[in-house]
């Protein structure tokens, strides 16, 4: 009988890049469905448009580099980047914004540094920051959740609003006729109210806040949390970064809330508002741009959580995950250098 001789580690199952990406995309679907349920068809349209642009850019770059187009498209990394950009921007943002952001993510952030596995920054978050800094008004104008809006746009209405086609007078009248077609998120509303001298309790008495979190956003975050837990169960990601992000945000927001409950939101609000669960399980866990050792991943995640709280409360933008992730990406080599695991048989570095 012939025995196959193989060196360690003796892995019993191989997880290819395409398999990992497929699992991440599938686990994103619950959050995407709930997000569409609360914020309309615009989110799905943005995701589909981003996928088309991302795959086209990926194929074009591979053609220019004389690489295999089929192999590059089949790893599903471009599709995942497109979906993350699509769910991050407002549902009714103009079509050219999602096109610009996706092209920037794939061509500049990903392939300018050598392609998959070589990019320094998370492509989706780099694209989001580009759009947020360049077009702050459009990037902070979210459609009102379906549970509080007097009317919500249909599929046709969403297409016309995104692509700015049809009867322009009618579309403008439609925009003005919907109460809250463009509105601030709960994070932005709280930040604005606190700057005007209102207390947290007074601000959260508004209808946009649903029992201390935010209409729609609690369920969206809960759906992404469920998908993230499945992702952990499938071992597509490790628990260190997600735990670090949530723990860092929870501890920082708890300290702030205990010191000044009138001007600081509760930890529950921070955990289930904005892009918290999406970022903790699907964005910060990008293995290319994160720290590599288990202890380093915990520090990396905790750094993101603390930075999110600082920027949310002291910065100029209501949600801060994109900035926090990019800043942590910068710190990842530093963390890896000083948090190296001890090699067996050698002293600690």
UniProtKB/Swiss-Prot annotation:
Gene Ontology CC: one annotated term: plasma membrane
Membrane topology label: Multi-pass membrane protein
EC numbers, comma separated: 7.-.-.-
Protein localization: Cell inner membrane
InterPro entries attached to this UniProt entry: NqrB/RnfD (IPR004338), RnfD_bac (IPR011303)
Record keywords, A-Z: Cell inner membrane, Cell membrane, Electron transport, Flavoprotein, FMN, Membrane, Phosphoprotein, Translocase, Transmembrane, Transmembrane helix, Transport
Top-level taxonomic group: Bacteria
Transmembrane segments: 36-56, 77-99, 124-144, 212-232, 239-259, 265-285, 291-311, 315-335
A biological process from GO: electron transport chain
Main localisation: membrane
Signal peptide annotation: none
Modified residues (FMN phosphoryl threonine): 185
Cofactor: FMN
Stated role: Part of a membrane-bound complex that couples electron transfer with translocation of ions across the membrane.
Entry similarity comment: Belongs to the NqrB/RnfD family.
Subunit description: The complex is composed of six subunits: RnfA, RnfB, RnfC, RnfD, RnfE and RnfG.
Protein name: Ion-translocating oxidoreductase complex subunit D
């Amino acid at each position: 009988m012939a025995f196959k001789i193989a060196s360690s580690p003796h892995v019993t199952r191989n997880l290819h890049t395409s398999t990992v990406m497929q699992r991440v995309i599938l686990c994103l679907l619950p959050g995407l469905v709930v997000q569409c349920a609360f914020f309309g068809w615009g989110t799905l349209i943005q995701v589909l448009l981003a996928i088309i642009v991302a795959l086209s850019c990926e194929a074009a770059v591979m053609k220019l580099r004389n690489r295999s187009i089929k192999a590059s498209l089949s790893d599903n990394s471009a599709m995942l980047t497109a979906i993350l950009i699509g769910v991050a921007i407002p549902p009714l943002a103009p079509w050219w914004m999602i096109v610009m952001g996706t092209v920037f993510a794939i061509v500049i952030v990903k392939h300018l540094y050598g392609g998959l596995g070589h990019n320094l920054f998370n492509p989706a978050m780099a694209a989001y920051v580009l759009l947020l800094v360049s077009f702050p008004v459009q990037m902070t104008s979210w459609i009102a959740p379906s549970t509080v809006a007097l009317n919500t746009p249909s599929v046709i209405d969403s297409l016309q609003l995104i692509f700015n086609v049809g009867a322009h007078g009618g579309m403008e009248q439609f925009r003005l006729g919907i109460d809250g077609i463009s509105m601030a998120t709960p994070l932005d509303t709280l930040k604005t109210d606190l700057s005007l001298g209102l207390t947290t309790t007074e601000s959260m008495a508004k209808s946009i806040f649903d029992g201390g979190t935010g209409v729609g956003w609690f369920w969206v975050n809960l759906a992404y949390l469920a998908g993230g837990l499945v992702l952990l169960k499938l071992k597509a990601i490790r628990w260190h970064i997600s735990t670090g992000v949530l723990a860092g945000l929870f501890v920082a927001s708890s300290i702030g809330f205990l010191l000044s409950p009138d001007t600081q939101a509760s930890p529950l609000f921070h955990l289930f508002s904005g892009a918290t669960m999406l970022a903790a399980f699907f964005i910060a866990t990008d293995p290319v741009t994160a720290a590599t050792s288990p202890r380093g991943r915990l520090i990396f995640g905790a750094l993101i959580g603390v930075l999110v709280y600082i920027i949310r409360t002291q910065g100029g933008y209501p949600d801060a995950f994109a900035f926090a992730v990019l800043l942590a990406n910068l710190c990842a080599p530093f963390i890896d250098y000083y948090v190296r695991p001890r090699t067996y048989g050698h002293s600690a570095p």
